[in-house]
Amino acid sequence: MRFWLAVPFLVFVLALVWCAGFAWFCVDALHPVSNPVHCDGIVALTGGRDRIEASLQLLDKGVGRKLLISGVGPHATLSQLSEHAPISLTPELASRITLGRRAVSTIGNGSETAQWATQNHIRSLLVVTAGYHIRRAMVEIHRAAPEVMLHPYPVRSPALRRSPNRATFSLLLHEYIKWIGSHLGLSRGVNLTPQS
């Protein structure tokens, strides 16, 4: 009998913890970009032009010696990806950039990044993606490459620059649920597209 009396209380506590976690997640997603940590490499996860532009600027400033842009479409070129970047894409800079075309999900980003890090002897990595995506990206990359030291570099997404609305709330809630799922090891789908 006491057990059944405790159930509503436990549900209330779990709901409170869940809501507090979501509130923290929202604040964290909107956190301003901090000064970047110098690393061996930089990885930018596709999904927004601002992520690629930020990663190219970081590479140009010498924050990392190599850059992986993970999740690039099969026909996209480096020139197309960098056309709006506020830097000059010199041949020397271009030679330090790898376009990863096999990842089709965040899990795939992790696998693709791990392979690239091993091939290029990367021991520390700056992860560039949207603020709402950074925590899940860090989980998946760490799972795939636990030996690499990761540092987050969240970029403010255009979707979060506007006044909060239903779409913003839905985006953050969806990402929060997926972040929890990634911690629990759920939704472990196909990592990479098949190699040709």
What are these regions (language model features)?
Residues 27-166, 172:
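A structural signal for short, hydrophobic/glycine-enriched beta-strand patches
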Residues 2-33:
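N-terminal type II signal-anchor transmembrane helix
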Residues 20, 26-36, 40, 178, ...:
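Proteins with a high burden of low-complexity, intrinsically disordered sequence enriched in S/T/G/P/A and R
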Residues 163-194:
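A transmembrane-helix-recognition feature enriched in membrane-embedded lipid enzymes
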Residues 15, 21, 135, 179-185:
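Generic signature of intrinsically disordered, low-complexity segments enriched in small/polar residues
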